[in-house]
Structure formats: structure tokens, C-alpha cells
């Protein structure tokens, strides 16, 4: 079965997922908005800014033209920064309607929209009418593009309220090194995917400050607890957070030098300024915007998220990291398991 896929976003993850789908035998159009990058992918079969050592399959075609990308399309895969998803979705909706296609919409982006605090699937539901899409599937889990490029074994979750569509996406992506599981808890999968980026900033900061494994383990474990609290308050199944999109994604993002969020936190821990770190990164660090959304959402829902609050204070109020750590340690005693 050959499927026509349009991948939106020619960054590291978008390029790798597009390449994987081509290798799985599907026809893929990779849409980007940078003419030089699109030309590089088509002519040199590289994307050196994001994947310096990776050779792209010559069958993968990149394009600047949404009309070309959506020709007879079966799947539209969003792999773009969270804060521009609404804008791009609003642009593609009339193109899909004009083409007369009704694809499955898949998102592999991870974050919460600033201002509205909405999950990505909620944004897509609002911007792409139901009569021009065939369901929405969330793709999430512990996955760095660099590892998938090396064909390291990787497992993700395909989540949808429509299990049949999740199973179809599962079939399209799976091969001998890339395995998907299905889940119907879209809220839990998306909340875990978004919020782990915030905790990864903290984990990186601890490393930059010179803290050891005990401290990092404490932060990640208690970070998962508050991710779960907010997720459950939003309607998620608490068991989702011990799965791939919860603890799995938190482990890989909170411990790896491949993680932009971890690297950003590490640089902050070493004493660098946030604006300088983000400028030098040259790529979107989702956890920074998501931290603000998570902080505001927790305030609205009266959910206790002390680690997220501390990271927010560092990012948005200029507070000292060590002072925030001290404040966390001076809190009154609490039960370990508490979803309130």
C-alpha cells in the first residue's frame, strides 16, 4: 500500500520522518518555506543546517508550493513550531478544500499554544473543518531525529479518538527500527509531549550548575508528577504518563545533548542569558513558550506545579536558578502521590 503524504516542516524531525516514509515505500512531498533549503534537499539530498551528516533518500521531493504538496494527498503531517501551527493550518484549509481531498491530519509537533493554552489537536480541529479532514492523529514519544537517522530502534505513540485512524498511521510508519503503539487518550499524550519540554529545561539547568544524578532524578520524577497532575485536571488518563509520551519522552528529552530544551537549560545553568542562548541555538526551543502556557494554565486550574513555577520565574522574571532551587527544597512536606 502506497500512501501520498505531505510533510509540513523541513527541520530535523520533519526531514527524518519524511525520509522514513519514503523508505517505507510511500510518496512524500516535504514542504518548506526556505528556497535555499528546499533546493538543497532536492539537488544535494542534504539538510546540513539540521542534519549535517545525514544523506537524504533521493526519492524525497521538497517543495515550496502547497498545491504541489497536496496533490491527491492522503496524510498531512505537521512538523512545525507550535506557535505557527494555527497560521499554517489556516493557510492550508482552503487549499485542501480546492483540491477536493480529505486527508488524515497528523501532528508530530509538541507544545501548547500561547494565549489560548490549547493543545495542537485542538488548534487543528478549529482551523481545518471536519468535512475536509479524515480525523486527527497525534504522533509522540521518545524520539530524537539524530537517532532515527542512524536507524536506532525508536518507539512512539499514535493517539486519536478514532482508533481506526491511529491504527492506519501505525501501519504507515512502522518498520524494523521504528515501532508505533496506539492510544485513544489524546489529551494525555499531548500534555505529556508538551510539558516534558519544560522539565527538560530544568534538567539541563541542573547539569549546567554541576548537580549530580540524584538531583536530576529527583527533578525528573517530581516533574513527571506535576505533568500528571495538570494532565489529569485536563481530563487525561493518569496511566498515559507512565507510557511513551510521558516518562519515555521525558527521559530522552531530559537527559540527552540532542535535546534543544536540555541544551538551553544547560546553558542557563552555566550562566548564559536566555536571549543569547536562543539566538545561538538557531532553532525553536518549544519548552520556553510552553512553560508560559503551562504556568498560566496551572494558575487557572489551581494545579500545584512548583517546578514549572520555578522554571517560569527563571525564564520570565529573571530569577536566580539557585534561589529557585532553594525555594523548592524549603517547601513544606507533601505526600508523594497526589493528583490535586
Curated annotation (Swiss-Prot):
Annotated protein name in UniProt: Glycerol-3-phosphate dehydrogenase [NAD(P)+]
UniProt keyword annotations, A-Z: Cytoplasm, Lipid biosynthesis, Lipid metabolism, NAD, NADP, Nucleotide-binding, Oxidoreductase, Phospholipid biosynthesis, Phospholipid metabolism
NCBIfam families: PRK00094.1-2, PRK00094.1-3, PRK00094.1-4
Residues that bind sn-glycerol 3-phosphate: 110, 141, 143, 196, 249, 259-261
Known EC number: 1.1.1.94
Family as reported in the entry's similarity comment: Belongs to the NAD-dependent glycerol-3-phosphate dehydrogenase family.
GO CC terms in record: cytosol
Reactions performed catalytically: sn-glycerol 3-phosphate + NAD(+) = dihydroxyacetone phosphate + NADH + H(+); sn-glycerol 3-phosphate + NADP(+) = dihydroxyacetone phosphate + NADPH + H(+)
Keyword Aminoacyl-tRNA synthetase attributed: no
Amino acid at each position: 500500500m502506497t500512501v501520498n503524504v505531505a510533510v509540513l516542516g523541513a527541520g530535523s524531525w520533519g526531514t527524518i520522518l519524511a525520509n522514513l516514509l519514503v523508505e517505507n515505500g510511500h510518496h512524500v512531498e516535504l514542504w518548506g518555506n526556505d528556497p535555499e533549503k528546499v533546493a538543497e534537499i532536492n539537488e544535494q539530498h542534504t539538510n546540513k543546517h539540521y542534519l549535517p551528516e545525514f544523506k537524504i533518500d533521493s526519492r524525497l521531493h521538497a517543495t515550496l508550493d502547497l498545491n504541489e504538496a497536496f496533490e491527491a494527498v492522503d496524510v498531512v503531517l505537521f512538523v512545525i513550531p507550535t506557535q505557527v501551527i494555527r497560521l499554517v493550518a489556516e493557510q492550508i484549509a482552503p487549499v485542501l478544500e480546492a483540491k477536493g481531498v480529505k486527508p488524515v491530519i497528523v501532528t508530530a509537533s509538541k507544545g501548547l499554544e500561547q494565549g489560548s493554552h490549547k493543545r495542537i489537536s485542538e488548534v487543528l480541529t478549529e482551523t481545518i473543518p471536519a468535512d475536509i479532514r479524515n480525523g486527527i492523529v497525534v504522533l509522540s514519544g521518545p524520539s530524537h531525529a539524530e537517532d532515527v537517522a542512524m536507524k536506532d530502534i525508536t518507539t512512539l505513540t499514535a493517539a486519536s479518538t478514532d482508533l481506526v485512524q491511529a491504527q492506519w498511521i501505525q501501519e504507515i510508519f512502522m518498520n524494523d527500527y521504528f515501532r508505533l503503539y496506539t492510544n485513544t487518550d489524546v489529551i494525555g499524550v499531548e500534555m505529556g509531549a508538551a510539558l516534558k519540554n519544560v522539565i527538560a529545561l530544568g534538567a539541563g539547568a541542573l547539569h549546567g550548575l554541576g548537580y549530580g544524578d540524584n538531583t536530576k532524578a529527583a527533578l525528573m520524577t517530581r516533574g513527571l508528577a506535576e505533568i500528571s497532575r495538570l494532565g489529569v485536571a485536563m481530563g487525561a488518563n493518569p496511566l498515559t504518563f507512565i507510557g511513551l509520551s510521558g516518562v519515555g519522552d521525558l527521559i530522552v528529552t531530559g537527559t540527552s545533548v540532542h535535546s534543544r530544551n536540555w541544551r538551553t537549560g544547560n546553558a542557563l545553568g552555566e550562566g548564559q542569558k536566555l536571549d543569547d542562548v536562543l539566538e545561538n541555538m538557531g532553532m525553536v526551543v518549544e519548552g520556553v513558550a510552553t512553560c508560559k502556557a503551562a504556568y498560566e494554565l496551572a494558575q487557572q486550574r489551581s494545579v500545584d506545579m512548583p517546578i514549572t513555577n520555578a522554571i517560569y520565574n527563571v525564564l520570565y522574571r529573571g530569577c536566580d536558578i539557585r534561589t529557585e532551587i532553594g525555594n523548592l527544597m524549603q517547601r513544606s512536606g507533601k505526600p508523594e502521590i497526589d493528583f490535586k
